[in-house]
């Protein structure tokens, strides 16, 4: 902070706040009197008529948090009365900064001790800052500055504490144990308001932590990821765990790269690579305020300097601008329309709130900061003044927004001071709103509400003017006009009649298109084609259920297209294609997301015979071979596999969506596709391993598909269950390459490379999530299994559940002779006559365990409901195992469940029961395929897209969900009865 003016609480000469009730005032005065019993300063104050006395009574009456703190810790108030506010705060912040130091030189404290020290310092700082703020001895700038300074000190102390502890345990070797962070290579960035020095009263803190794996402090680089993960888990605990002394700060580390799949701390180089290759515009905005606050500050500054080209691009990037504007639209649309209600309003995120001012600034920083370094500053007020000085906004706008910003920050602080809660919502009740009004010095809630409404409207108006442009959509109808910022009333009425519930949002989206904010609409020709197409687009989308949702998904798709001329021309000349697009957008958010993320998959929809041709193995194989054949090296071959797999999965989905194929056919097609992709990946992997390690004389490999892959029943998004079998000549000890490997390591390497080829995430996505737990001994066994070991295990060690799983085993690619041997083993095991009573007992126990550990969520959980797909699969697999003992021929392993059920049931089931089970299997498969295709997650009729609800009803020719649900209940109840009867009767 800048040099603080020496002010004391005794300087208060006017009391602007007052208690909200006499009862609160009495309670506050009682606290003061109790505190005076052990304090001369407080006793002297109570006996006086000083304004400070009235102020403290009002402050404690208005804030239960402050009152409770004064009651529990009167010494804090005593200390505050005896020194200036800056002196008091500086001493507490310095105490926090050195809280990591132990009594003995170089000895690390227990976590509990530093937690206590930091919490006590936080309590004292929070108490003092609140009183200074409420009394207006501090303005918003000082309040946020002191809070930020304390947060920086607390995080620094915690980091030094953790580094010193790691040093003492031998994990690190510090340069200087008296200054643990010095030259440590540990980068701790404060993000958001902490980075800008604008922390709010009860704020959480956003941190990003990187480390240099080459740093000399790290003793074992292989352990570094886990070491840092443990340290950061302790950091979070030190700062945010609530103890008897309270907490320091809620700590959020989710602004790091890809937080869902990365550790809490990641290497600097990995972070830089992420931002350079995958960084998003919202991450650019987040890093505008980033600041090194702890750890190795010099390393932090170097990192931010290196990151500058990512955050502030030298040239205007129109795709980025489109993205920025898209964010702006989304925020605006989220706010709704109509009058701003004060009660319950979100001061941060609501219309006219703090976030809109921050976004107003950051948007222009992202666009102009690359060419104008003066626009790269962190603080909101400073940046508003710089934007005015640089001519980006006028001076009046800057002053209005600065005044509004600090007014809203004052409101935010009062809301949070009441109970020390991280909330931004104004109270819903009149008494509680009056409390906030009095804390701000207003006479009543009406005057506060009027002042707040004026500020919110000012911010909203200035925010809405950001990048204001004009464009007109010319149409023959004359009642679709999209000009400037204001909606045309006639246009809104037309959109309502077309079927849209939120016409203003739709109009806003269309204005966006015609402003050229997306890459697909940047060229004049593209905008002209889209202009001509828009009336028909609106008509067709308006005919779909929940037209607004579908239209929004189409907008999302459009925003990701690299170009638009070809698409707009095709849609204009091909009504069928337009209807198909609408079908996707209204029914299948998952497919809509796929084409938004990977527009190239859309190309396949242009094939004239798409819906007429079944995607059989013969159809898919040449297309895959031709496309992959152009790969020049290993990685390119894998990328081509990812591209063609994504495209063909999508096209299979389109056929299912339109009813061109059934759910059963989709399962077979997805399985055929997986077979071909895995086979091609195996060929590439074998070639890659051979180039490094040579061939293994007599070496043979075969891939076994298990589960739904084995039985031709994959769904969209299914993972794949694999087993890799191998064999080799016994007399050969190692491969014949430049870097020879023994047989176990050689075929393990093949397996590991295959898993990576199929499941490693890349820019083109992944092929499949691979599960190899069905191999002998599961995760405890080797990843690759020799054929002799596989046979021995199946004959002597396998459990019943593993033999049940073997009924779906199918060799999908590999050496033909080894495939033959594997199939012979499958047949041998599955034709063995078993103890039926034992199989029955095991199956009943397994099904009971699933019921217990994985209960269905609801009737729409087709897999797990009693009498659902799991029961039907158990029936088929159970019958396959007991068939030999009952003189019935089992179908080959890897037979589709429906075919196996019919073959086995014909000799071992009641004919009506067999028909019912088959009917249920077909319906549940159809529904499962559609749901997995169209959405991620579970099917909830209340939340599902309207188009998907229609689809699942049409899947079984049901008029509505009520009839469909009734039939699901009928069939599942019957199947559970059949399951119990089949197993019990066997």
Swiss-Prot record:
Q: Does the keyword Transport apply?
A: no
User: Which intervals of the chain are annotated as region Adenylyl transferase?
Assistant: 475-986
What cofactors does the UniProt entry give for this protein? Mg(2+)
Q: Its catalytic activity?
A: [glutamine synthetase]-O(4)-(5'-adenylyl)-L-tyrosine + phosphate = [glutamine synthetase]-L-tyrosine + ADP; [glutamine synthetase]-L-tyrosine + ATP = [glutamine synthetase]-O(4)-(5'-adenylyl)-L-tyrosine + diphosphate
For the keyword Cytoplasm, the answer is: no
GO molecular-function terms, A-Z: [glutamate-ammonia-ligase] adenylyltransferase activity; [glutamine synthetase]-adenylyl-L-tyrosine phosphorylase activity; ATP binding; magnesium ion binding
What does this protein's UniProt record list under function? Involved in the regulation of glutamine synthetase GlnA, a key enzyme in the process to assimilate ammonia. When cellular nitrogen levels are high, the C-terminal adenylyl transferase (AT) inactivates GlnA by covalent transfer of an adenylyl group from ATP to specific tyrosine residue of GlnA, thus reducing its activity. Conversely, when nitrogen levels are low, the N-terminal adenylyl removase (AR) activates GlnA by removing the adenylyl group by phosphorolysis, increasing its activity.
- What is the protein name stated in its UniProt record? Bifunctional glutamine synthetase adenylyltransferase/adenylyl-removing enzyme
Q: Which organism is it from?
A: Rhizobium meliloti (strain 1021) (Ensifer meliloti)
Gene this protein is translated from: glnE
